[in-house]
Every structure is written in structure tokens, then in C-alpha cells.
Amino acid sequence: MAKTSCEIILCFFFFILSFRVISVSAQQTCDNTAGSFKPNSTYDNNRRLLLSTFASNVTAQNGYFNGSFGLGTDRVYAMGMCAPGAEPDVCSNCIKNTAEGLLQICLNQTDGFSWSGEETLCLVRYSNKSFSGLLGLEPSNDFFNVNEIRKEDQKEFDSVFDELMFRTIQGASSSVRNNSNSLSLSGKYYAKDVAPEPVYGNISVVMQCTPDVSSKDCNLCLERSLDFYKKWYNGKRGTIILRPSCFFRWELYTFFGAFDSINARHPPPPPRPLSPPPLKTPSVTNQTNITKKNDSRISGGTIAAIVVVVVVTIILIVVGLVICKRRKQKQEIELPIVLNEAESVQFDLKTIEAATGNFSEHNKLGAGGFGEVYKGMLLNGTEIAVKRLSKTSGQGEIEFKNEVVVVAKLQHINLVRLLGFSLQGEEKLLVYEFVPNKSLDYFLFDPNKRNQLDWTVRRNIIGGITRGILYLHQDSRLKIIHRDLKASNILLDADMNPKIADFGMARIFGVDQTVANTARVVGTFGYMSPEYVTHGQFSMKSDVYSFGVLILEIISGKKNSSFYQMDGLVNNLVTYVWKLWENKTMHELIDPFIKEDCKSDEVIRYVHIGLLCVQENPADRPTMSTIHQVLTTSSITLPVPQPPGFFFRNGPGSNPSSQGMVPGQSSSKSFTSSVDEATITQVNPR
């Protein structure tokens, strides 16, 4: 019974010891002097996102990856690498486990690193400051074997040891040799060697530096590690020294990886009796030796069986939890059938949260009727604009589905590009390319910014909008009516080229369909055509009307939603321009900022085209194909325009002053009380 109890105690001891070795096999070094962050902060989220992708990034880059993610003070810099020759799956597992270990141990430190591995050697390092090319000696971490070289053998041992260390340091820090034999940067500074020692068998050594440092710095880092061993652990039978920029390990047995306890082969028996043989695993400084009597010795097979059973059990539990979690996530983000047809990428919510700083106010670009827009940056450095639809808006969900299906089918230089979407729980996100110069109205209606839009730029903007709408109506696979063309939905890129945005109200027409009706009218007052406002009827000619309003706004620099008095009548911009046309005083319309650098005949021709677009009868309005033709060919004679719709007559209740308004003041009216169902029609390519 006593023997059995002793065996149980020893089993428990070796069970704990085995986990002690496993914990050392993933040693993390957290820098407590570099700074800290709050859990779940933007920096923490960026760190988690970056490290969670490291395994695939490192293997994709042949064993070495150096990158960053985030913006400003929340930016995370990281490096990952494997020893040269590591199989991709082995390298991937090593990086994955090492990164996870750092996340679990370095809970709030802004800097940390870990050299680890059981089948191969790998490194993961992160910081809130760029460290590429800089030698990192601190913080350092070290381990040693508590057993020692016998004093009478020390001199002979040192002669072999010193020569081996010198040779290995020179080999590891020689980038010329390694670069000539390796396609991967991970092998730039790497060396391993074995030297026979007459008393203790073989001395095995592995050294490696990160490839971003110079050969001189690599040599310095490894020499510092050797000096550290000589000063503090000289005479020990094995040492591991870890620094941010280099790895140093030697043992009296051959080994794989960084901290494994597996012997590739047993060292040859010593020629004369020695003290008890060295431990097969490096031990931490407070580890003590256990002397086991013959009658209480437990077999290695029993220990292995216990460890295997426990490890397998833990793995099964973890796998079960992961499967359950993934099933739950799939249920939460299951998409409607119509979204599955979309040709766009579905982003994980955590990716978008990390890219936008968890939708921070600092990254907010603006807000609209159905949500807010944020700037962000993806892991690969791509800048994005994220539209976050309001959680309380029923119309937002309809528009979300509509926009994904519509925009996913479109590819044109004058249409904003949809990169993807995210639909998880209550979050509905649309991810677009980032367009740096905001929208047309930001410049056009600001007296201090309007001077940046000279006539050449404005003419180019009109031409780009024309090509974009023509693509929607005629040249794309689908016939699409935008229904919400306005200055705030025309974005401008870095070169002031226009991109049409916001397809939440867009409708897809059949091949032979020319007109559609809706019982619920939505849109912005002033841009909507008369037939759409009064009868709910829309077609390609509805977009033409909106385009005509845009032309008049671009040339005049005036808002269509403002009121203007002329000849005793109250006019919006469209009817005001018509009166100028009738009075042949079109020069009064031209924005003073472009009068000096434009040809008045050319500008008046553009106004003429704008008036043709806003005619009351849809049949009188030209198609976008015709508009494109007359804009690019000045020799084509234009027909005389007919009066536009929405005349404001000077009668009772028509004077804006009686409503508390003054001439030129914006009414800013929009039809928001009624919601269009925006039913998504079947997508049929032409």
C-alpha cells in the first residue's frame, strides 16, 4: 500500500513536472518598462488582430514577416519568424501557439516577445514602436541546467566549448553565407553545430538573430549572450538566453526546437564514471533534483501515458468549445439568400472594429440619414470607409441588402467601390474604398473652399458623373436607376475625380423595363423629378433630372434647396436658371470663381444641357448616352429646352419671407417621413 501511495505521489510529481517543462516550452518575455495599455482598448484589439493572423502571414512569406497595423498611438508593430527549413505547417503551428501565449501572458504590456517551439524554433515579437533594424538586447530571459561540469574537467571542456561558440557566432552573424543558400530571410542569421567532447559526449548549439539587424549587431547580440553565460552560469551543463534580437542555446544533448525535452540520440557513454548524468531538460533556476529509489521508480511509459491522456483530454475539450463557438457564430451571422448572391467579401466584425478603432469619434467622417461613416485601415494597409447603418432604422436593413446586391455587381472608375460588408448580430456594415477628398458639396457650397474647383476641375467632375450614370443605365450588366443623385453623394478622390456613392435607394430594372412605380417616395427635395414626387414614377429619366440639377449647382456654386427671388417670383435654383435663360442673362449664373478661367460660350452650353435635363416632361429629357455625346462633341446643335417643373408662383402663401425665410436661404426639405420598401428585384444580367 505504501509502495502504491509512493508511486501515486511520484506520478503526481512527474505530472506536474511535465507541465513545468511544457510551460517553459512557450516562454514569454513581457517588457514591464516600455508601457502598458488598458484591456480591450484599441491598441489591445489591434494587437490581437495582428497576432491572430501571424501564422498565415509568416508561412506565406517563407518563414519571416514584419508588419504593422493600426493608426497613430494605437499602431502595433510585430515580427514573426521560423528557423530555416521548417515545414510550413510546423512553422504555422509554432507561430500560432507562440502568439497565443503572448496574448495570454502579456496582458497589458505594450512590448513583448517569445522565442519558443518544440518541433522548430520560432519568434513572435510586438511593440507600440517601430523596431525594425534596431538591435534589441533587453529585456532578456535565461534558463540553465542546475547540473554542473566537474571542476577537474572544466579546463578541457572550455577549450572545446570556446572554439565551438566562436565558430557558431561567426557562422550565425555571417549574412553572406546564409543569403547565398536561402531564399528566406529567416535563414539570414542562423547557425547550428555539434562538437565532440571527450568526457561529456557532444556539445550541441543553436544560434539565430532576426534578419532585420545588421551582421555587426547580430554578432554583438550573440557575444553578449555568451558573456552573460560566462559571468553568471559558467560551468552549468546547458543554457538558454533569449533577447529580442537573438537566440542562444547550448546543451549536452542534441535537440529540436527551442525548449523541447526530446533527445535526437543519446550521447555516447562517458569513458569514466561521473556524478549522476545531466538532466535531459533545461531547468529553471529554482528547480531541484529528485533522487528516486529503485523500489519507488516509476516507468517512463507510465508517465508518458498519463501526460498523453491529460493532453488529449484537454485538446478534445478545447476543440469542442471551439466547434460550439463557431456554430454559434455561424447562426448569428447567417445571411439572407439574396446577400449570398453578392460578389463581395464578408468581413469579420472584429476586423472592422480593429480597423476603425472600435468606431472611435476620431475616425468618424460624417453621418447620414441611415447611419455613420468611419475611416479605417485594414491589416494590409488599405484605407477604407465604413458605413455603419443605424441599429434602430428598419429602412437601414433594407438599404443594406439592396446596396450589397447592387454595388457588388458594379465596376467603374466613377463609381465608389464596395470592398465588402459585415452582418453580425445587430451590426450592419458596408466597407468601401476610402476616397480622401470627401464629397462635392463639401467644396462646392463653401465660400472658402469653392476656389479649389476651377472650371477645368468642374468640367472634369461633370464628365465623370456622366460616364458613371451612363455605365449604370447602359453599359453595366444590369440596368440600374440610382434614385438619389446629389452633390453629397458625389465623392472626390485625391485627383478630384468624381465617384458616385450611396446605392441604398437604387433599383434594378429588367432588360426591357423602362419605368417603375412606388407608393412611397424617398429622396432629397430639389433633386427629385416632378413625376417621381407627384406620382411615385421613376425611370432613367429621373436620374437625368437629378444630373441636370447637379450641372446647374456645379456651374453656379448655389444650392438647389435655396430660394431666389426674380421678377416678383420665388424660385428654386432650377426655375431661377430658367428665368435667366428667358431673359438671356445667363452670365449672372456663372460662379465668380470660374468666370476668369472659362469660356463663357462653353459654360452656357453646359447650362443649356442642364436645362434640357430638368424639363418637366420625362420624354423631352435626353438620355445619358445623348448627354455624353453632346458634352464631348461641341458641333452638335442642342434643341431649345422646355420649361422645368416645380414653378413657384407669386401667390398667397408662396412667399418664403412669410414662412420666416429670406431669399437665398436653404429650405433643406427632404421626404423622410415615408419609407421606400426598396424591394430587391431578381438580378438578371442583360
Curated annotation (Swiss-Prot):
Phosphothreonine PTM sites in chain numbering: T524
Limits of the Protein kinase domain: 359-631
Residues bearing carbohydrate: N40, N57, N66, N108, N128, N178, N202, N286, N289, N294
Enzymatic reactions: L-seryl-[protein] + ATP = O-phospho-L-seryl-[protein] + ADP + H(+); L-threonyl-[protein] + ATP = O-phospho-L-threonyl-[protein] + ADP + H(+)
Region annotation Disordered: where it falls in the sequence: 266-287, 647-686
Entry binding sites for ATP: L365, G366, A367, G368, G369, F370, G371, E372, V373, K387
This protein's name: Cysteine-rich receptor-like protein kinase 17
Organism for this UniProt entry: Arabidopsis thaliana (Mouse-ear cress)
Gene behind this protein: CRK17
